[in-house]
Amino acid sequence: MDIDPKLILFGDCTYSNLLHHVQLKESGADISFVSPSKFRGTVTAGEVTYNHILQMYPFENVLYKVKLSGREIITYLEEAYSIFGPKVGNQRKLIGSPQNFDCAGGIRYEADLDKPAGKRIKILGFNDGRKFNIDSVYSVAMVSYRANGGGELMMKATGLQAEELGSRVIEKYSDVRELLFKFFLSGRSLKKLEEN
């Protein structure tokens, strides 16, 4: 099964499913946020080496677990999906950087890009059947770049300044590339991951 990071902008893909799986499994968080990679290529099916992981995920990011309210999670996703502009013909233009896009794992949600900003995201519930409550506080797995204010999504979601975001960190884990390498060393199949 091929891994193509740019497909993340179009919905579920192997790349986002892999990162969500790794982040949720390592952290035990309720929700996972992941973003596209700058990698412009595909890791083809077959044996995956550490070099493939460096190509697919070139960033030095540590996995963080942070706390966000349900309302902040919706605001975060609203900000992430704000990179999509209106449709021109049958194509939707990007009005923001794809690097400032995140998608969520661990929850079922709809993103209606034809709705106005602030009304695009509807969270239906958790993958495990739990209900999502905007007033509850949840644990969210994300990379250190985002947790420390990269792309400003955390600041816009919480209303905090970058230097205040440390108050939201619950725990820090290993480098994401190491976690990906561990996944492939375990012999897990991407196909089985896609089926779950």
Regions found by a protein language model. Give the residues of each.
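Catalytic centers of hydrolytic enzymes
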Residues: 1-196
